[in-house]
Amino acid sequence: MYADIIIKNAKCITVNNKKVFEWLAIKDEKIIAIDNGEKYNSLINKTTIILDAKGKSVLPGFIDSHFHLVQTAMNEEGVNLHNVSSFEEIGEKIKKANLKSKETIFGVRLEKENLQEKKFPDRKVLDKFSDDTPIWINNLDYQVSILNTYGLLYYKIPFRIDGIELDEKGAPTGIFTGKANATLRTNILNSYSNKNREENIRKLIPKLLEVGITTVNAMEGGYMYSDKDANFIYEHIADFPIDIVLFYQCLDLDKVREKKLKRIGGSLYIDGTRGARTAALTFEYNDKPGEMGRLIFSQKELNVFVEECYINKLQLSLYTIGDRAIETALNAHEYALEKTGIKGLRHRMEHVELASLPQIKRAEKLGLIFSMNPTYERYWEGSNKMYSERLGKRYVETNKFRETIDSGLTLCGGSDSDVCDYNPFVGIHSAVNHPVKKHRISLYEAIKMYTINGAYAIFEENNKGSLEIGKLADIIILDRDIFEIDTESIDKVKVLCTIKSGKILYNTI
């Protein structure tokens, strides 16, 4: 038997253990050999492709465990407002966009904390930039939408819906939160065609391959999103060159069963976000005394739902940010386990930003998986950033990666794209360089978050996630030996080649 592809002169990091090999061979879609020396010569014929890694690292393809695929793809077409620092800069970008199109001007990823005004622009501010075209702006975590006056009239959202901010005269300011924001977002997202979805996903995938992503956990549908997104992914899941694992973000077990899906949830909200001060805490927000966030479900409601997931043997993934939400989710899992005795479903908790040490220990005892987002630390950690503004001195308690791993819990990593950068090296860098030293993990542990642990979190550890004979040839070749660089340079690492199921889909070697 001859190999289709040989990667030689490499440092192949197996990830399932700490062994490093010099070469590997691929036939069809699988790894057929991995070893040291020059034994690969017997596997070469005239059609074998030989890739010389020149001493650089070779890793399994990355698995992003929390990725809003349709949302990210569609938002690539939007006006990126993440780094703007003033209303004036917003205006410059909107005016530039208005020259290109008379359709809705869609702004994404706006952070109030980055603005010198320290508040969101209202409709009157946006009207100065365009008064004859709808403007729709989302903040970074999608908890806030902003419309100009034309947009208010165009989208016809009833003014009596909860979450529509009113000025002193009782007129809408154009700023939508809560139910109003969710209604507006869902209405607009429902208007997208499947042709739009497909075209934009196909444009996005080469960018994912360029950073080494070969599998995404697609969090689609449900509150604040569109079920049309989830249905599109379900119907077209095999049409794209990377692996897509659908997490249908709904409460409808019948719908999930009809589709024969093995899991439910994703961003299935138990609470809100820190930015909007809706993440459910056991203490008051530092910058808003009296506010402790909110729970979406009562304990009784969540107990019933979680028990039903156990009974139906569905892997459940719950969105939990604040410690009070984490407590509620753990209570529900303990209730369901006691009622049913069913184990081994690898239920997940997403984000888990403020878990206490006792909560981490309880989660480990329950056999739960933490799906966390290290890049949050890059965006919001630090004494003058959003975590410290919202949490005060407790900002040092966020994202306990070290403690999670030490407890024995499986920890997988995701970007939460497009809230954060989907480049896995940014996530790995953030986990290794957590601003709070005691929460940091090693480079090897961080790589496992995006490879073998990500595979385990979707029951795929026997098929992918490590470089082993018989596993899928999901492989990336880096531009350097990642274990020989300074930890401060991890986010500078590039991918030279991405192989998915034995096919070279990105290559600059």
Regions flagged by a language model, labelled:
Residues 25, 268, 498:
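Short aromatic-centered micro-motifs
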Residues 237, 256-259, 342, 363-365:
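Acidic (Asp/Glu)-rich catalytic clusters
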Residues 259-262, 362-371, 407-410:
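Glycine-enriched alpha-helix->loop->beta-strand junction motifs that scaffold or abut catalytic
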Residues 113-115, 144-145, 216-217, 223-229, ...:
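Flexible loop/turn segments at secondary-structure boundaries
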Residues 68, 262-278, 368-378:
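Non-cysteine beta-strand/loop elements that form the S-adenosyl-L-methionine
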Residues 239-260, 264, 346-352, 357, ...:
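Phosphate/diphosphate-binding loops
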Residues 2-8, 13-240, 246-251, 275-308, ...:
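Divalent metal-binding segments
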Residues 307-317, 324-347, 352, 372-482, ...:
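His/Asp/Glu-enriched, well-ordered alpha-helical/loop segment
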